[in-house]
């Protein structure tokens, strides 16, 4: 009976450590800035790891009043580029935790 309590206490300590490490990794990921680019940097966007846009840069030559659709497409491409980088890094950083938890 005592042995079982020791195992449970040890398991709880491991879970607390895991939770602390997950939070640290998530905080670092959220603070990381990811850039998305389109058309030779005609449009560059910056996002934090928690998907908040912090900056957008549009080169003058990308602005054509007669072709608004092109600029919209460039912005979408840059945003999607940044989002895929965030998703990839999130999977690399946080995926290690779900691999160690049965059922996830």
From Swiss-Prot:
Q: What family does the entry list?
A: Belongs to the YbaB/EbfC family.
Q: Which Pfam families match?
A: YbaB_DNA_bd
**Where does the record place the region Disordered?**
1-24
Which keywords accompany this UniProt record? Cytoplasm, DNA-binding
Record-given protein name: Nucleoid-associated protein LSL_1227
Composition-biased stretches (Low complexity): 1-19
Organism, by scientific name, is Ligilactobacillus salivarius (strain UCC118) (Lactobacillus salivarius)
Q: What is its main location?
A: cytoplasm
Location relative to the cell: Cytoplasm, Nucleoid
How is this protein annotated for GO cellular component? bacterial nucleoid; cytosol
């Amino acid at each position: 009976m005592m042995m079982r309590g020791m195992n449970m206490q040890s398991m709880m300590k491991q879970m607390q450590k895991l939770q602390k490490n997950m939070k640290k990794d998530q905080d670092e990921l959220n603070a990381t800035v990811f850039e998305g680019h389109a058309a030779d940097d005609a449009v560059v966007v910056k996002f934090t790891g928690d998907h908040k846009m912090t900056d957008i840069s549009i080169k003058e030559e990308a602005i054509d009043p007669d072709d608004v659709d092109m600029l919209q497409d460039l912005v979408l491409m840059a945003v999607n580029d940044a989002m895929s980088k965030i998703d990839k890094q999130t999977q690399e950083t946080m995926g290690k935790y779900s691999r160690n938890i049965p059922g996830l």
